[in-house]
């Protein structure tokens, strides 16, 4: 601006969208299990359709292969229609671990012998799937060495609060994989 005052600004913006065009791995039985046609590092998970409400609900649902289930456990959709919920029912979901958009902006100010520069940056359209101890504050077992977050303890499915749409599934006494699967829940 003048000999004593200097101001400058800067910014950046990048956009990146990718898709796997070729993969020499053998094709999967179901097209949605293949990497070709999807972005690199595409997250895959099970589609949650709520929580089991009763033993009758469990008996009338496809078999889940991630351990025995009880009322209050996450209920998953049978994508391939074979009556069994397993790794073949995982579908692409969400953004990948590679951001589509990166951005930044900054400003520099100098007045006499005083200098100040600030830069801000960010990324968006990026995803991460979390589960297990990242959600519950422990491995989900009430016998583990960790503690549950208060949020989980107060908003989970219980026999006294049998809400099939509870924010969190039931808690369990020991290692249990069904409720820790990567999913839309």
Stretches with model-predicted labels:
Residues 2-97, 135-137, 144-177:
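Conserved small-residue
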Residues 175-185:
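Short, intrinsically disordered, charge-balanced linker/junction segments flanking boundaries
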Residues 7-11, 105, 111, 116-118:
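Transmembrane beta-strands of outer-membrane beta-barrel proteins
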Residues 121-124, 129-136:
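Short Gly/aromatic-enriched secondary-structure transition segments
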Residues 92-93, 103-106:
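Generic recognition of flexible, low-complexity loop/linker segments
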């Amino acid at each position: 601006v003048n000999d004593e005052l200097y101001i400058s600004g800067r910014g950046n913006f990048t956009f990146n969208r990718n898709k796997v065009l070729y993969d020499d791995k053998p094709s999967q039985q179901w097209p949605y299990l293949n990497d070709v046609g999807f972005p690199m590092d595409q997250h895959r998970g099970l589609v949650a359709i709520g929580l089991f409400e009763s033993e009758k609900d469990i008996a009338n649902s496809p078999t889940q292969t991630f351990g025995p289930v009880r009322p209050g456990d996450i209920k998953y959709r049978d994508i391939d229609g074979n009556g069994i919920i397993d790794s073949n029912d995982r579908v692409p979901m969400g953004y990948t671990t590679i951001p589509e958009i990166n951005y930044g902006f900054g400003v520099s100010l100098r007045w006499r012998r005083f200098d100040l520069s600030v830069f801000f940056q960010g990324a968006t359209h990026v995803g991460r799937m979390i589960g297990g101890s990242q959600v519950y504050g422990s491995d989900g077992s009430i016998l583990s060495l960790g503690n549950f977050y208060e949020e989980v303890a107060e908003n989970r499915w219980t026999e006294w609060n049998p809400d099939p749409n509870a924010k969190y599934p039931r808690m369990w006494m020991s290692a249990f994989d069904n409720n820790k699967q990567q999913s839309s829940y």
